[in-house]
Amino acid sequence: MGYAHPEVLVSTDWVQEHLEDPKVRVLEVDEDILLYDTGHIPGAQKIDWQRDFWDPVVRDFISEEEFAKLMERLGISNDTTVVLYGDKNNWWAAYAFWFFKYNGHKDVRLMNGGRQKWVEEGRPLTTEVPSYPPGRYEVPYRDESIRAYRDDVLEHIIKVKEGKGALVDVRSPQEYRGELTHMPDYPQEGALRAGHIPGAKNIPWAKAVNPDGTFKSAEELRALYEPLGITKDKDIVVYCRIAERSSHSWFVLKYLLGYPHVKNYDGSWTEWGNLVGVPIAKGEE
């Protein structure tokens, strides 16, 4: 049994075959925002996840109108096929995928294996920045069914206790146990408290990928989640520190395994670890 929605994944071969396709736009989304300038897939444009997606004043996402303007600037219309890829096994590309889906874009795909696979296969790179005619775009709706807010998570803790829901903390075991507030080898910043949301199971996001950055098989992915009670019949909320890693796990659960009710808590530990009056847990559960 394969992936529930194989159409959302494209291979490096597929991308190379569609480099001249006017109906396709390829976007690179990296943690290292300078990486694009060192060489990228021919025709690919750059998304700076912080500058392009976040409102700097309210610490939230840009509005529907601003998203539409961003799409038009990138030459994307509502019927454009958008292909996303990036570094770090596609974690920020997956975040962009989630944000495109939140804004109701119909045809969004991830390049399986991301930037790493493209480079390792010796495929072409360029430093030339492409230019496209402006697109015509209107955000059809915002899909709140895939986004969890802090109040939703507080209510969800009760569902988890009742066996009707599941929480997945996709961070490193050290962050989950409360030993660190960020990944190992990163500056320890962003939260006053360390630990995890009570009831959460720790399934690090990177367990879902192979050494070459491609996703593991559906059978392997089910074996990763189901033994810990992360099953299709439950409402599921995933989180990390600022939602890029949890977007990757959200993609796995919703699109590769076909779980119907999965939300990404984009406030994640940066919000939860700083909130007054909410519970945390430390150690293993």
UniProtKB/Swiss-Prot annotation:
Residues 20-127, 161-281 form the Rhodanese domain. CDD domains: TST_Repeat_1 (cd01448), TST_Repeat_2 (cd01449). SMART domains: RHOD (SM00450). SUPFAM superfamilies: Rhodanese/Cell cycle control phosphatase (SSF52821). Disruption phenotype: Cells lacking this gene have a m(5)s(2)U content in tRNA that is about 40% of that of the wild-type strain. Moreover, TtuB-conjugates in the deletion mutant strain are similar to those in the wild-type strain, suggesting that TtuD is not involved in TtuB-conjugate formation. Disulfide bonds: none annotated. Keywords: Repeat, tRNA processing. It comes from the Bacteria. The modification Cysteine persulfide is found at C240. InterPro entries: Rhodanese-like_dom, Rhodanese-like_dom_sf, Thiosulfate_sulfurtransferase, Thiosulphate_STrfase_CS. Pathway: tRNA modification. GO terms for molecular function: thiosulfate-cyanide sulfurtransferase activity. The keyword DNA damage does not apply. The keyword Transmembrane does not apply. GO terms for biological process: tRNA processing. Cys-240 can accept a sulfur atom as persulfide forms from cysteine desulfurases IscS and SufS. Required for the efficient 2-thiolation of 5-methyluridine residue at position 54 in the T loop of tRNAs, leading to 5-methyl-2-thiouridine (m(5)s(2)U or s(2)T). TtuD is a sulfur carrier protein that has a role to direct sulfur flow from cysteine desulfurases to m(5)s(2)U synthesis in vivo. It enhances the cysteine desulfurase activity of IscS and SufS, as well as the formation of thiocarboxylated TtuB (TtuB-COSH) in the presence of these desulfurases. This is Sulfur carrier protein TtuD. It comes from Thermus thermophilus (strain ATCC BAA-163 / DSM 7039 / HB27). The lineage of its organism: Bacteria, Thermotogati, Deinococcota, Deinococci, Thermales. The gene is ttuD.
